[in-house]
């Protein structure tokens, strides 16, 4: 049995399994000769299909994404067309756009070697909040999630935080295990700082900002970027944060000032992350903790 997994999000990639063994794994950028290539219906599509020219049939094709509200199904159609163009047929097609953080938790847990762990996922832009996906302006996305993981296949969601990224902070609203707020995820703050400096977005250039941290000075930007809400949640003070970044969005390029912002960014997100980890330890007393998502992969 062959299973083809395709990531149609940014930094696209694909992996072909045959009877549970990896036949190949390929990043699209290597085939497209474009460092930041991602699968689109207008830019050459799915380059990984070229590796299928000697394969007659795939039993299951499974897609993952961060849930693009309009474009995912177009990308999927593009990939399927590319597969058949190589003379390869396929059976079941699977795509669940609402479990982006579950995939991150799987990656962290099954690569860890642990038999049990709590997975903390911190991401810039996860799946959309399903109950509001069809509402105009309903752009709440996963930013943080907590899962209980046990071998062989027990992974249960314990907490989900969805963020809307509005300018003004609001009091978080909790619905079961779901919390909705207008706080900025730590990973997205990195992305916003990258953009304000004129770097690439989506965490691609987070390493540059981290390097600038070493040259930054403490206590230049004194107002905290995180505040504690009345509900006890730590949320970003978006007005303060954007006021600090605004000169750079307006084009100011002063290395020392940028380094000072990088210092502020690193310290603020570090303090927040540590508070989140202490909260997990207090609530769940886990034997192990695994970390995943764009923040931990790109920004830490």
How would you label these PLM feature ranges?
Residues 1-300:
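Short acidic/glycine-rich loops and adjacent helix/strand connectors
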């Amino acid at each position: 049995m062959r299973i083809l997994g395709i990531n149609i999000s940014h930094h696209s990639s694909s992996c072909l399994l045959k009877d549970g063994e990896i036949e190949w794994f390929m990043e699209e950028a290597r085939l497209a000769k474009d460092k930041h290539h991602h699968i689109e219906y207008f830019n050459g599509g799915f380059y990984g299909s070229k590796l299928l020219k000697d394969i007659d049939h795939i039993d299951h094709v499974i897609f993952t994404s961060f849930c693009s509200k309009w474009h995912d199904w177009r990308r999927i159609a593009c990939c399927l067309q590319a597969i058949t163009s190589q003379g390869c047929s396929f059976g079941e097609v699977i795509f669940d756009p609402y479990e982006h953080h579950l995939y991150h938790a799987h990656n962290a847990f099954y690569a860890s070697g642990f038999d049990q762990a709590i997975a903390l996922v911190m991401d810039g832009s996860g799946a959309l909040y399903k109950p509001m996906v069809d509402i105009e302006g309903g752009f709440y996305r996963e930013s943080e999630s907590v899962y209980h993981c046990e071998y062989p296949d027990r992974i249960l969601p314990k907490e989900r935080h969805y963020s809307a990224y509005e300018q003004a902070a609001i009091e978080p609203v909790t619905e079961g295990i779901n919390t909705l707020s207008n706080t900025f995820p730590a990973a997205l703050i990195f992305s916003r700082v990258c953009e304000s400096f004129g770097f690439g977005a989506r965490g691609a250039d987070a390493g540059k900002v981290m390097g600038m941290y070493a040259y930054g000075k403490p206590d230049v930007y004194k107002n905290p970027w995180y505040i504690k809400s009345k509900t006890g949640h730590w949320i970003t003070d978006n007005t303060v944060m954007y006021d600090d970044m605004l000169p750079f969005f307006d084009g100011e390029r002063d290395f020392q000032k940028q380094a000072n912002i990088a210092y502020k960014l690193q310290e603020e997100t570090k303090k927040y992350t540590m508070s989140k980890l202490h909260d997990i330890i207090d609530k769940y007393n886990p034997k192990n903790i695994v970390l995943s998502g764009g923040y931990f992969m790109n920004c830490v």
